[in-house]
Regions:
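A short His-aromatic
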Residues: 193-194
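A short beta-strand submotif of the Rossmann-like class I SAM-dependent methyltransferase core
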Residues: 184-190
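Conserved N-terminal segment of class I S-adenosyl-L-methionine
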Residues: 5-180, 184, 197-203, 235-241, ...
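A short acidic, helix-capping loop that chelates divalent metal ions and anchors anionic groups
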Residues: 225-230
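Histidine-centered beta-alpha loop that forms part of the nucleotide-sugar donor binding/catalytic region
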Residues: 189, 221-223
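Conserved S-adenosyl-L-methionine
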Residues: 252-264
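A short glycine-rich, Lys/Arg-flanked "PGG" loop and its adjoining helix->strand segment in the class I
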Residues: 200-212
Length: 281
């Protein structure tokens, strides 16, 4: 497992290799979109630093105790655990998304302490960003790779705000020993990794942990993702197929428009497919 220093050192080489692969595959549109997204994110990082860090608006984590109850602490059967590709590399965030959702939650839930849950959190940076704003932020990751490698935010947040868990099995998060409900639940490049037969339980977990009026935001893709001869994507549905499935299986989730472009989301793919929902009562 790579040290944090070696992981950072390898980033430029991985980026060049990935760019060459996209060019060979004729996916220059995706390469250009990703390059623009990276520039935009860097600009937002600067704006965020001026507005929040230098402005003294980062209050830090609230004083709460978070406990995860699960009979499946690791997704041992998942290809992502057996071949830890994305979970060993990703630590994504987008300060525009963070600032936009902060404004939206303040409007919709005034005078409340906000809660956010990132499912498939990888390195946990999105959790870290919401913690800095004073939110009750939690991240669940199916693989224990980042925990064991002590990468990204896991050394500081493991067992307190970051936990390993197979999210396709029943679980319950407790905050100060009370069942938790969150105002925002996110999944970035995760849904397609879930076995189709387990989607029902997954969305039962999501609805149970989503406060009435709360938001569910996810990215999806219908493309394969093959590593070491194994396709890590187990449910390759189009955006329309996901929406049809949710309309039938979990009608309490209602489609909503966040008014965000693809480069303002935390992660995106060539399809620019996103699921943006609110929970009814």
């Amino acid at each position: 497992m790579m040290s944090a220093f070696m992981e950072k050192l390898s980033l430029p080489f991985r980026a060049v290799r990935w760019a060459c692969i996209l060019v060979r595959q004729g996916k220059t549109r995706l390469l250009l979109a990703d390059s623009w997204t990276r520039l935009y994110k860097a600009w937002m990082e600067g704006l965020y630093a001026l507005t929040y860090r230098l402005g003294g608006r980062l209050v830090g984590p609230p004083n709460v105790t978070i406990r995860l109850q699960t009979g499946h602490p690791v997704a041992y059967e998942s290809p992502d655990h057996l071949i830890p590709f994305g979970t060993s590399q990703n630590n994504s965030t987008n300060k525009k998304f963070v600032m936009s959702m902060r404004a939206r939650l303040q409007r919709d839930f005034p005078a409340q302490t906000f809660g956010t849950l990132d499912l498939g959190c990888s390195g946990g940076q999105l959790v870290r960003d919401f913690l800095d704003l004073g939110y009750v932020a939690v991240g669940l990751e199916g693989s224990d790779y980042s925990l064991k490698a002590r990468r990204a935010n896991w050394p500081a947040l493991a067992g307190k705000h970051l936990f390993t868990c197979d999210i396709a099995h029943p679980f319950q998060i407790h905050i100060d020993e009370r069942p938790a409900q969150f105002h925002l639940i996110t999944m970035w490049e995760v849904l397609e990794h879930i076995e189709t037969a387990r989607l029902g339980q997954l969305f039962d977990n999501i609805v149970k942990h989503l406060a009435p009026g709360g938001y569910f935001v996810a990215s999806t893709t219908s493309e394969p993702d093959v590593h070491e001869g194994v396709d890590l994507h187990q449910t390759k549905w189009t955006n329309a197929e996901w929406r049809a499935h949710l309309a039938k299986s979990h009608p309490q989730l209602v489609w909503t428009d966040l008014g965000l472009a693809y480069y303002q989301m935390v992660r995106h793919n060539e399809e620019r497919s996103f699921l943006t929902y609110r929970r009814t009562s």
